[in-house]
A protein has these predicted regions:
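Short, acidic/polar
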Residues: 23-36, 85-101, 144-147
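Acidic-and-aromatic substrate-binding clefts and catalytic sites of carbohydrate-active enzymes
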Residues: 22-26, 46-54, 83-88, 114-117, ...
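Short acidic/polar active-site loop segments enriched in Thr and Asp
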Residues: 41, 104-107, 134, 158
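A short, structured active-site edge motif that brings together acidic residues
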Residues: 70-84, 107-114
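CE4/NodB-like, metal-dependent polysaccharide N-deacetylase domain
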Residues: 90-110, 126-130
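N-terminal binding-site loop/beta-alpha segment at the start of enzyme catalytic domains
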Residues: 1-74, 190-193, 293-302
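Beta/alpha (TIM)-barrel catalytic core signal, keyed to glycine-rich beta->alpha loops juxtaposed to Asp/Glu
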Residues: 113-302
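Short, well-ordered amphipathic alpha-helices
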Residues: 53-64, 94-98, 124-125, 146-147
């Protein structure tokens, strides 16, 4: 049973990685160490998470000459933040991430959000030319925006990282990305129950009794069933945890398969629910905080 996908760049990207968004200072280093010691070979981070230095401290203990792992055995992703989209700022932002992480190159560098993006993409392509990153990709882009990038790209995006879980199955976007040889990575694949803006009336994915019933049949946890569902669709998952036992549990999804019937059943849970869009109150109603930005990606159907 394959544990990785092959990107259009030829790189092998492990299907399950450790996410580090919302991991509190002081916890990230131990989480990364627990992940690497437990078999993870894929770490996902970003400048805006504010914890690349801690990730780097952990990598320094386990990766490199004389350490447990060679650099080419660990796939490391980071992301360019919105305030660094000026082409003049892109290389400096990338080098800053590399310094914090203690690395000479990134396996993958993503544009975190589609703000002004065509000139930014060209600057990111230069990072590939200079050997600072092996490949570049996108995050939170809709189908139209992906097409816009591909139309001008010298180095095509290899990944689009988006929110993806049974309540937001992204079937249309996944199909579009497949047709372009763009791999989809799922962030918040377990529904991000600890997101800062969650309200009590929102549904809890992990507590869905239908998932619980499926998990019981396979003698797995609901989290493992969700991750397996995405993995079987060829979607890379980066669940975040700082708990060693959960970090291990999330990787144990390669010793069972869901039946086609159960895959279809979980597909049917889709309700196009996005958890990862900060909302604000406006005229007594909740609205998407960045919804009026000209490049806001979620007004399109997918």
């Amino acid at each position: 049973m394959s544990t990785f996908v092959t990107l259009s760049s030829g790189q092998r990207m492990p299907l399950v990685g450790l996410g580090t968004w919302k991991s509190a200072p002081g916890q990230v280093k131990q989480a990364v160490l627990a992940a690497l010691d437990g078999g993870y070979r894929h770490i996902d981070c970003a400048a805006v998470y504010g914890n690349e230095q801690e990730v780097g401290d952990a990598l320094a203990l386990r990766v490199g000459p004389g350490k447990a792992l060679r650099r080419d055995e660990v796939f490391v992703t980071s992301k360019l933040w919105n305030t660094k989209h000026d082409p003049e700022d892109v290389e400096e932002a990338c080098r800053s991430s590399l310094t914090h992480l203690g690395l000479s190159y990134l396996d993958l560098y993503l544009m975190h959000w589609p703000m002004a993006f065509k000139d930014t993409w060209k600057a990111m392509e230069n990072l590939v030319d200079k050997g600072l990153v092996k490949a570049i990709g996108l995050s939170n882009f809709n189908a139209r925006q992906i097409d816009d990038i591909i139309a001008i790209a010298r180095h095509k995006p290899v990944v689009n990282q988006v929110e993806c879980h049974p309540y937001l199955s992204q079937a249309d976007l996944l199909s579009h990305c497949r047709s372009l040889a763009v791999c989809v990575t799922a962030y918040s694949p377990l529904g991000s129950g600890d997101r800062p803006w969650a309200s009590p009336d929102e549904p809890s994915l992990l507590a869905d009794p239908r998932l619980g019933a499926i998990a019981e049949r396979y003698q797995k946890s609901p989290a493992q069933v969700i991750l397996r569902w995405n993995v079987q669709r060829g979607v890379v998952c980066i669940p975040k945890s700082v708990t060693a036992s959960r970090i291990q549990e999330n990787l144990r999804v390669f010793d069972f398969s869901l039946s086609p019937e159960d895959i279809r059943l979980i597909d049917s849970f889709n309700r196009n629910t996005r958890f990862i869009i900060p909302t604000v109150e406006k005229d007594g109603k909740k609205v998407w905080r960045d919804g009026e930005h000209p490049h806001f990606p979620f007004h399109d159907p997918y």
